């Protein structure tokens, strides 16, 4: 397991299941900052989402691997003043349905696009973080006519991996590995997402919710099966070679202290900024900003800067 500490975007996924469960709990018990709604889609998929604010544009927030919709609350609190803001739990994640799905990037992108159609959303802007950024790019490539623009925050899918590297990464994150990660490693996995190298006090609820997951029995078993599928999906469906086909206005935001992009083990010659500038060079109509005092969770670490960049971009 010598590779585990340096896995790109995989560290958040692994959770322990070492405690004996004595009470019936559910991820539906999680406290969300806004009222949760649900929309039924095809193939028995049900998506939990929040819908706040009004405006001429609809901002659709897509979380990353192992995350959930509350990760966007610092952004929605500000942006809902001028825009309609919709954030969801992707299928398989806390309050959404948990079926026997593929959980690859195509699956998630199709869910996003169907949701746009089902809710009759107009002037839609996808805002994706990490894996959510890769999903947003996939959706933009599949149905650009449904979208107005893209905002990608520390997105996955830009850094490329060889088949051998991908095989190693996938082999390390199995259902059993997800279950058996020690509690102290969970905390380290959260800490590495933030610029200070420690989870800030106002983000500890994410860590606590993750620990709570262990006692949700069948829901957690599903989560442990799903995470490896998500990882395989990111690695098996790269978008880099198709980035030049994204024509819509795109905002790229990367935290200057992103410790997950690039992968330090496989790509020690790269920097976060070099990955970011590569993305900008490939997406024709894009602009890039490096966010100071921000790690992989840039939208949380420096929400003021991120919100400012989003507002300026949307007003153009």
List each language-model region with its residue ranges.
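Short glycine-enriched nucleophile-adjacent loop
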Residues: 133-144, 150
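Flexible "cap/lid" loop of the alpha/beta hydrolase fold
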Residues: 141, 150-181
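Short beta-strand/loop motif that positions the catalytic acidic residue
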Residues: 246, 252-254
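Alpha/beta-hydrolase fold catalytic core
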Residues: 3-57, 82-83, 284-287, 314-316
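Conserved HGGG/HGGXW glycine-rich cap/lid loop of the alpha/beta-hydrolase fold
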Residues: 45, 50-95
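Conserved alpha/beta-hydrolase catalytic His-Asp/Glu region
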Residues: 181-244
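Active-site loop/oxyanion-hole signature of alpha/beta-hydrolase fold enzymes
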Residues: 32, 42-44, 50, 90-127, ...
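Catalytic active-site module of serine/aspartate enzymes centered on a nucleophile-bearing elbow/loop
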Residues: 282-316
């Amino acid at each position: 397991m010598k590779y585990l500490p340096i896995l790109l975007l995989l560290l958040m996924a692994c959770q322990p299941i070492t405690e004996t469960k004595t009470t019936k709990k559910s991820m539906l018990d999680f406290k969300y900052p806004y009222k949760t709604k649900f929309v039924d889609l095809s193939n028995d998929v049900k998506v939990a989402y929040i819908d706040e604010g009004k405006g001429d544009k609809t901002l659709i927030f897509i979380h990353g691997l192992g995350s959930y919709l509350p990760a966007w609350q610092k952004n929605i609190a500000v942006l809902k003043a001028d825009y309609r803001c919709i954030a969801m739990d992707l299928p398989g994640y806390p309050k959404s349905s948990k079926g026997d799905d593929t959980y690859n990037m195509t699956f998630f992108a199709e869910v996003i696009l169907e949701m746009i159609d089902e809710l009759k959303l107009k002037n839609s802007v996808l805002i994706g973080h990490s894996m959510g950024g890769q999903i947003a790019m996939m959706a933009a490539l599949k149905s650009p006519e449904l979208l107005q623009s893209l905002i990608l925050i520390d997105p996955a899918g830009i850094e490329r991996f060889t088949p051998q590297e991908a095989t190693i990464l996938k082999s390390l994150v199995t259902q059993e590995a997800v279950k058996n990660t020690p509690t102290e490693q969970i905390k380290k996995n959260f800490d590495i997402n933030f610029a200070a190298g420690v989870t800030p006090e106002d983000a500890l609820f994410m860590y606590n919710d993750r620990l709570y997951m262990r006692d949700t029995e069948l829901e957690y078993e599903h989560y442990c099966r799903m995470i490896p599928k998500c990882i395989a999906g990111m690695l098996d469906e790269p978008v880099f070679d198709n980035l030049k086909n994204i024509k819509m206005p795109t905002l790229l935001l990367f935290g200057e202290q992103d410790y997950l992009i690039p992968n330090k083990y496989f790509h020690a010659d790269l920097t976060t900024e070099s990955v970011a500038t590569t993305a900008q060079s490939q997406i024709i109509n894009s602009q890039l900003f490096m966010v100071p005092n921000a790690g992989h969770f840039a939208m949380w670490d420096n929400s003021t800067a991120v919100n400012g960049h989003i507002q300026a971009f949307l007003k153009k």
